Amino acid sequence: MWVLQALAIMLSIQAGVLDLVEVPPVVRSLPVALPAPVNLPAVLPGSPGLNDPAKNRMLPPKRPGAPSRGGKCAPAARYFLSSDKLQAYLLSILPPQIEDMVKCDKVNMEGVLGDILATMQDSNLLSILDITSLLQGGGGLGLGGLLGKEGNEDPSKPSSGSKATGGLGQLLPEGLPGKEGLGGLLNLGGGKGSGKGLLNGDGLSNVVKPLDDIVENVDSLKAAVQDKVKSVVPENIKDPFSDLLNMDIQETMLKLKVKQVKVGSTDINMGADGIKVLSEVTADVEGEGLLGPVFTLLQFQSVMDVTMNIAVSSNNTQCVNLDVQDTHMHVKEMNIQLLQTVTETVPLPTSLPLNDIIPIVLTAKMNENLEKSDSCGIVLSDFNDCKNTTGLFGYQVHTARISPKGLSIDYCVKANIDNKTVPVPGGRLPPDPKNANVSITTASSALRTLVKYVAKQSSVQMNDLEAQITYIAFAPQENNMLRLLYKVDITKDSQPYATGETKLFISHASKILNSKLVPDVKLTRSEHSVVPPETKEEVEGIMAEVTRKAWSRFNELYKKMSIPDGVSSNTLTNSDVKLLRSNDLQAAS
């Protein structure tokens, strides 16, 4: 019957007939099941759009930018840094920076948490503490021991006098005076005298003295425990335990401060799209002003993940750096730890019923504060000092890329000879040495550019003879030797007269010390031949002068030879420069 009446009411509303200011008696009599009120704040600070499910998850990282590319030249040099060395650098530099970021004033983790707790001003301690786990924790030394509720005891039954003394009773060694009065002091059993022992003062004076003796004689029991225990039993409070459990949160949390941040583990994944970092972090936020019988400290411990993407950037210069992108803090849980000091400090993690809300608000607000801050972010400025260097060869970044093997930087190369800039042709570079941490490779075209320039500058005139190098080539030999071959056209009175051929054998023992090339080349021997042979005696002098001039010029320029800067935090400190079969130069460590 009432269903039909309700239907009639709905139709009347649609027709605009019924005035809803006065509720009809039929509706007033309908049974309604109301849920029990929940003592939670309606609006949490700094959490706009909290009900948006998309904001309750970790923010997806932005896609890293494409590898940095320079001009259209073909690379003629490469610097390589292995993934092991790169990860070692990140593992040494990231954890302290992550800790500083979480503790940063502008991220304001403690302030955000304080604002959340401040909204619970109508709540008491029981509304946020999972009191069941407290009553079961600590082996009778927590609130369960003090209230006579052991972990396996039915909380609906009256507590027994013997178990009621278990908590503080374990604090008093056998034989100390006053221990026998503890049962009277904490007579919280279900009998008629429940609670009277605490208020009539019997045994109270006998407990304070033993507590003083414990603090003095047992190193593991801190003085703060005694002070907190005393504060529970002031004479003017009739029910101190009730007052403790119903203490207003704002009275207990006078101040919040991030005391310690610790990075537990850091995983680094290197791929073609950059470096992905995941760090597990715990942050302890301490509160001052808590009154408790056996606990000296109330800690809020946040467990979070810090993620970031790291890409390479060069801005088309000779320097490459690491750019930290998409730093994100994801608070997974917020625990309360009650640190108990008896023989040692024992953390008792206590879950928050609000664990589904507090981490979400902290995550959103802390990331918002981090994004607004200009001083809390992670900057890897010491990865590369990016100094402008000069030398015989100039290097400009062509491509910088990250791969599972490590960081590779390819360079365009130009030779700066006699105030002239000569592009160095690029080509296919040899692979990086196996198991190398750091390596530098310079294409054979760099040495060829140098040799060709020397050949053009080695013309000689002597009496009526003139010699000019018309062909030059070089090839590697055993034991890091270099054979340089060149041909000379010799004219007499401007007419072709003879053709000479010279082979120079050069030892190569150059090194890279502290990222600088230390040249060491020596001319060990030379061989000459002339066509026609009958002109040999006449042209020997001019051919020797060509050799002297060419070698002098080559040696002078080679000593000015420079190498790519690479990364200043990972350089070659003492490495031999090897001449490969491909005529490329390579050094590694």
Curated annotation (Swiss-Prot):
The lineage of its organism: Eukaryota, Metazoa, Chordata, Craniata, Vertebrata. One of its GO terms (biological process) is sensory perception of smell. Residues 1-29 form the signal peptide. It comes from the Eukaryota. GO terms for cellular component: extracellular region. This is Vomeromodulin. It comes from Rattus norvegicus (Rat). Abundant in the lateral nasal glands. Also present in the posterior septal and vomeronasal glands. InterPro entries: Vomeromodulin. The gene is Bpifb9. Glycans are attached at residues 419, 437. N-glycosylated. The N-glycans consist mainly of complex sialylated and fucosylated biantennary structures. Residues 49-71, 146-170 are annotated as: Disordered. Keywords: Glycoprotein, Secreted, Signal. Its main location: secreted. It is found in: Secreted.
